[in-house]
């Protein structure tokens, strides 16, 4: 599995954000995009997962495992995303949030996958919890478990550690990067913090928009 991003241009109606960018992310690796606010980092992720604001113009291609996915609807792209704010359904328990992500199948298999994820993320005691009662680190774990239960073939990380304190941030980085390696899927991380970089050899700095 590999994720490839070929960008000729990414622009707003009045401003060029990104030009002539080519990334190929190998399985089990995390490539980092760094840039200031407004440099187009999050918009690039939106172009990959299919949620780009229609006001922006993306001229390029997104390939997953050699196949173009930029013409597919978001739900067909097999790309997971972890946001800065761990977006959990507030009307569902933690278990129900996870079950929602599991692909269709028999009930017993789906429940088993959720149970395994709860144990793997060390959040089993929180299965029946209201998401509003979770700490920042717990929310990241639940959101990550939900993203992986959808069985993505690539993972996007939109500054998911930025709201955590320094110690928790380090632990969550290690958890996420380890899971990317274990699942052997490509991951693309955007951040403005150099401490979040998974591998300095896999780092692209975006220029200020102009």
Question: Which residues does each PLM region occupy?
Answer:
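A short, proline-enriched helix->beta-strand linker immediately N-terminal to the Walker B motif
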Residues: 149-153
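Conserved ABC ATPase signature
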Residues: 130-134, 138
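ABC ATPase NBD coupling module
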Residues: 53, 67-84, 104
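Conserved ABC ATPase "signature" region
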Residues: 109-126, 177-178
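Hydrophobic anchor residue at the start of the ABC signature
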Residues: 144
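ABC-type ATPase nucleotide-binding domains, specifically the catalytic core motifs of the NBD
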Residues: 53, 73, 92-111
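Catalytic Walker B motif of ABC-type/P-loop ATPase nucleotide-binding domains
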Residues: 155-159
